[in-house]
Amino acid sequence: MAVGKKLVKAREGIDREKLYAIADAIKLVKERATAKFDETIEVAINLGVDPRHADQMVRGVVTLPNGTGRTLRVGVFARGAKADEAKAAGADVVGAEDLVEIVQGGKIEFDRCIATPDMMPLVGRLGKVLGPRGMMPNPKIGTVTMDVAGAVKGAKGGSVEFRVEKAGIIQAGVGKASFSEEKLVENIKALADAVVKAKPAGAKGTYVQRVAVSSTMGPGVKVEPGSLNS
């Protein structure tokens, strides 16, 4: 069956105008996650912000209680004892000038990037490479830190970085279709709570405007925002 026909069939039984309670929405999404691989469950949160204004930027990191189901490759820019700590904590790639050269050459072998503060003048050279990928280390989300071991373990243990996009939307993977409904709901509520706590001072009016959940290959299901309150 062609992908288009599969999507049309998957939409059957979903009221496109209804706002579902989060548990009901997840049930519908899981029932329609029928691909031959373990689909990622994704959340899209529309916020009442304009990220073009610095005082309306929303970003942060949250550790999902049940993990993401994905194994992240973690790269760390550090020297000496901190480099050793990163390796011991399970970092996939650790280096300093040597790692900068590798990344500048277009070889990025990590999904999350962490750096000690003293490395940032060096890492700053990679802004044009890491910035567009959303991978530039940032102290606000704990990826510029002296606690490299804790940051590596957090990344490996299910922490998710979120950042509002130009259209005012935050999108994040919160688990796999193989997760139980209960675990997915817990993860989504944890993400929503972190997004609410990251509300910027410049946000006006309704902050969380729309929420939808979907699987990698499945249709979106609209969610009643109030059902995300823990």
UniProtKB/Swiss-Prot annotation:
GO biological process: one example: regulation of translation
Keywords, in A-Z order: Repressor, Ribonucleoprotein, Ribosomal protein, RNA-binding, rRNA-binding, Translation regulation, tRNA-binding
Gene3D superfamilies linked: 3.30.190.20, 3.40.50.790
GO MF, any single term: tRNA binding
InterPro entries the UniProt entry points to: Ribosom_uL1_bac-type, Ribosomal_uL1, Ribosomal_uL1-like, Ribosomal_uL1/biogenesis, Ribosomal_uL1_3-a/b-sand, Ribosomal_uL1_CS
Pfam annotation, one family: Ribosomal_L1
GO cellular component: cytosolic large ribosomal subunit
Record's subunit section: Part of the 50S ribosomal subunit.
Homology family: Belongs to the universal ribosomal protein uL1 family.
Function: Binds directly to 23S rRNA. The L1 stalk is quite mobile in the ribosome, and is involved in E site tRNA release.
HAMAP family from the UniProt entry: Ribosomal_uL1_B
NCBIfam families: rplA_bact (TIGR01169)
Protein name (Swiss-Prot/TrEMBL): Large ribosomal subunit protein uL1
The organism of origin for this protein: Afipia carboxidovorans (strain ATCC 49405 / DSM 1227 / KCTC 32145 / OM5)
